[in-house]
Amino acid sequence: MTIHRLKTWPSHFQAVKDGRKPFELRYGGDRDFAVSDYLVLDEWDPNTGEYNEDEDPLVRLVTYMIDSERYGVSTDYVVMGIRDVTDATYSQVLDRAPERSERPGPRAGHDTEKGGG
């Protein structure tokens, strides 16, 4: 089980938070995503290059994965089914999560799946 901390564009962040988006589409070439991993999603604005400090991170459990061209997904990308976690799990995961990345993310309108999810 790995904890992945990910920048998430505002529209995607809100859709996950509201429960309208129970999946994540991400570039997987630089990460080894797997079922039972946790995603810590931080709302990050690509236009300002800043995190939204008014929003707490979202923690989601990866429950399912599609990562094969057989299903129409490029070999560099992965689609993950995700679900919310309990309050106790949320705290435990955040305590062990890596720090936020201060690296610049992708530019707005460019390579959205790599940075926005």
Question: Which residues does each PLM region occupy?
Answer:
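Short beta-strand-centered aromatic/proline hotspots
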Residues: 49-66
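Glycine- and charge-enriched low-complexity intrinsically disordered segments
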Residues: 64-117
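Short, charged beta-turn/beta-strand-edge "cap" motif at the junction between a beta-strand
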Residues: 29, 44-49
